[in-house]
Every structure is written in C-alpha cells, then in structure tokens.
C-alpha cells in the first residue's frame, strides 16, 4: 500500500512505527492480540515524550506538537491514536498536577512505555456539566491509619465505586486517573489508581465493534486504599477547567488525523470520481487547515481556559468534518470499499462513528452551548 500525504509525517519521523501501524491497523481495530504492544511501540518512536519539558525527561516542544503526534498516528491507526491520547493525556495530568512527588514517581515509567496511563475522566467531565454524579466515593480514614501500626501522618482514604469505560488499561500494568467524591464533603479529588492496588478489579475487555486493541475495559474499586501521594488534585472542578483544553485538544488530534486520511483516500478513486468530488474535497481541506490552526493556537495560548465555548464549537465542527470526509471517502471508494481487506474504508467508517460519542459528546456540547446562549439572552450579554 502506498503512503499518502497524510501519512508522510509519521513515515518521515518514525518509519518503523508507521510501517508497524500500517501492517496492523486492521488487527488493532478488530481484535486484541496486539493490545499489549501499542504503548511500547509508541514509546520506541519517542511519541510519549513530545511536548514534555526536557528537564522532566521529555523531548521538549509544545502541546501543539503533541496534538500533531496524535493526528499523525490517527492517519495510520485510530486505535493506536486513541491509546496515545490516553497515555499522553495522563502524562499531561501529571505535568499539570501540583503533586511533584507523584509526578517524579510515575513519569519515568510512563514516558518509556513501561506503564500505561489511562484517563477515566468522562464521568468527571459529565459531572462538571451536571449530567451525572461522580461514581467513586472516598471515605476518610486518616485517623484510623495514623493511629495504626506504621501509620503515617498524611491523609488517607478508602475508595469504592467504578468506571464503566476506560481505555489503555494495559494488562501488563496501568495507572488510571479517576475523579472521586469525598463523603466528608468538599470539592472532589482526582486520584491516580494503580492496577495492583488492593481492591482494584479490571474487567475483561469490553466486547466492542471496533478499537478492540485499545485495552478498553471497566474498572471497579472495592475498599481501595489511597493516600495523599496518589492525589493528582484536591480540587477537581477548578483543575479540570485548566486541563480541559489539553485533554480536548489531544482528543481532537484524533479527528484531525482521520480527516486527513479520508481526504487523501478520495485521491485513490478513479479520475471521474475524483473530479466529481474535487470541489468538496477542496472545501473540506480548507476547513481542516483553518480548524487545525485555531485548535493548536487556542490550546497553546491558553485561550480556551476562559472561553471553553469556542473549544466546544471547534470540537463540534471537527466531528462534522470527520463525518463529511468519511462520507466522501465512501463515495469515491465505490464497491472496493465494501469488500473486506481491500481498503481501510469500512474501518474508517467505524472510527468516524466513535468521534461524536466520546466525552464530551456532541449532544452534550450542543446542549451546553444552547444553555449558555439561553443564559446570555436572559442577561442580555449575547455576543
Ligand atoms: C470504545 C470506547 C472507549 C472509551 N474510553 C473511555 C476512556 O478512556 N475514558 C473515559 O472516561 N471514558 C471512555 N469512554 C466513554 C465515552 O467517553 C463516553 O462517556 C461514553 O461513550 C458516553 O457515555 P454513555 O454511553 O454512558 O452515555 P449516556 O449517559 O447513555 O448518554 C447518551 C448520550 O447523551 C449524552 N447525555 C446524557 N445526558 C445528557 C444531558 N443531560 N445533557 C446533554 N447530553 C447528555 C451523553 O454525553 C451521551 O452522548 C469510552 C467509550 C467507548 C465507546
């Protein structure tokens, strides 16, 4: 299979990873046989260190560069890009955490791909939007543990609850970020929960229609002990507002790569098909360039911390672009796209179907924007 323009970025900077992904993209989507290899492959190509300061073990650069890496991988394999999103987003949580000891403890293993990082914060994002309550509760046991043998003087808790969906729960070892409500009251916290902590149970992989090589499962905690050393933040709502642009920016990277690849694939059709869609492809290509620039500069300049609505609108526009580009690819691919093993058309249709549902989902964002607009109308502050 020849390399398309959208694939040249990764092929140039990480040729071994690019060929591995091209050889296994279908397998990564349809079964779990290679699920343990994805994080080490991404690490060998150096992608986990992109946008991480050199003094912390990274290769420097910006969050914009990390968004580009996710997009580059998505042009080859959306499943691998989703794993990269989970891992790199967890790394970002540590970079933005005030808990330096936690960062020092976990970062080296995450950057070299020995440990997988999973982000279970959909529940927290939905909580922020008043859609659902937090699903994990913490009981403060500080007094109990500090009076027991060997007890320390730092806060400690026991947590109970679960998360129905988390990606990158690599069976060889993971740490998962989860938001936790405190029985004692106060703002919820976000903790890093280790795979081998007592009471942690990872389900079997969920029986997905695609993205099956992503180690996606449910996670249950029963009386799991956690300490201050495990806490990413003690004020989840305030911290999430600051981290959300990077979280969403990296997630949007997956859409950028998918759109690029689908638009490139329209060139693989015959001359008549190409000319029929040429104007549409040109319009979508322009939109892609403009959305890419706005996304990366907005995240880099920190604009979306105070104006999340503009980021939500970008996410919605990108999801619509994914849909339009994937549809054009189907049209130009003809019957070949409907035959197994001849192209990535069917796989990209499944991948595109995931984009609107990943949190924050399109319906969630549309409702939030509508509520905000209603509020502005009431207060006469429509812009
Ligand atoms: C393959 C896969 C991997 C995933 N990986 C992760 C992961 O790594 N980490 C993680 O945290 N999550 C993950 N998720 C969860 C995902 O991000 C979404 O949260 C989940 O798919 C949507 O939740 P639900 O199906 O329970 O939606 P439901 O709660 O059933 O809601 C259906 C839809 O309506 C929206 N909705 C519900 N109530 C409201 C409301 N009041 N106002 C507006 N909109 C509303 C929801 O956002 C959703 O789009 C994954 C999901 C899948 C399919």
Stretch-by-stretch model annotation:
Residues 22-30, 271, 289-323, 327-340:
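C-terminal helix-coil-helix/basic helical segment that borders enzyme active sites and/or dimer interfaces
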Residues 1-60:
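A generic N-terminal leader/anchor concept
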Residues 34-44, 48-160:
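Glycine-rich flavin
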Residues 336-383:
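Glycine-rich phosphate/cofactor-binding loops in nucleotide/flavin-utilizing enzymes
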Residues 206-289:
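Glycine-rich beta->alpha junctions and the first turn(s) of the following alpha-helix
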């Amino acid at each position: 299979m020849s390399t398309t323009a959208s694939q040249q970025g990764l092929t140039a900077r990480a040729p071994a990873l690019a060929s591995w992904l091209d050889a296994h993209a279908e397998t990564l989507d349809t079964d779990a046989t290679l699920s343990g290899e994805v994080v080490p492959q991404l690490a060998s190509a150096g992608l986990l260190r992109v946008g991480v300061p050199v003094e912390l073990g990274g290769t420097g650069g910006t969050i914009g560069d990390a968004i580009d890496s996710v997009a580059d991988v998505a042009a080859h394999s959306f499943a691998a890009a989703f794993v990269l999103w989970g891992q790199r987003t967890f790394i970002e949580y540590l970079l933005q955490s005030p808990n330096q000891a936690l960062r020092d403890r976990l970062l080296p293993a995450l950057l070299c791909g020995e440990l997988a990082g999973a982000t279970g914060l959909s529940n927290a994002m939905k909580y922020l939007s008043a859609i659902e309550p937090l699903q994990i509760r913490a009981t403060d046991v500080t007094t109990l543990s500090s009076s027991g043998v060997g007890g320390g003087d730092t806060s400690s808790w026991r947590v109970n609850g679960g998360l129905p969906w988390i990606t990158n729960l690599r069976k060889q070892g993971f740490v998962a970020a989860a938001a936790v409500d405190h029985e004692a009251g106060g703002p919820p916290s976000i903790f890093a929960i280790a795979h081998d902590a007592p009471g942690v149970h990872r389900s079997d992989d969920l029986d997905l229609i695609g993205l099956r090589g992503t180690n996606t499962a449910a996670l249950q905690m029963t009386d799991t002990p956690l300490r201050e050393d495990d806490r990413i933040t003690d004020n989840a709502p305030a911290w999430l507002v600051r981290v959300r642009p990077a979280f969403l920016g990296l997630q949007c990277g997956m859409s950028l790569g998918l759109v690029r690849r689908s638009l490139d694939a329209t060139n693989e059709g015959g001359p008549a098909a190409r000319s029929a869609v040429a104007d549409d492809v040109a319009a979508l290509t322009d939109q892609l360039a403009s959305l890419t620039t706005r996304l990366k500069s907005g995240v880099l300049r920190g604009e979306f911390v105070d104006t999340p609505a503009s980021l939500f609108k970008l996410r919605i526009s990108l999801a619509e672009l994914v849909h339009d580009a994937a549809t054009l690819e189907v049209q130009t691919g003809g019957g070949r796209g409907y035959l197994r093993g001849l192209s990535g058309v069917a796989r990209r249709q499944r991948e595109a179907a995931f984009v609107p549902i990943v949190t924050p989902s399109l319906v969630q964002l549309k409702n939030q924007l509508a509520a905000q607009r209603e509020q502005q109308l009431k207060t006469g502050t429509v812009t």
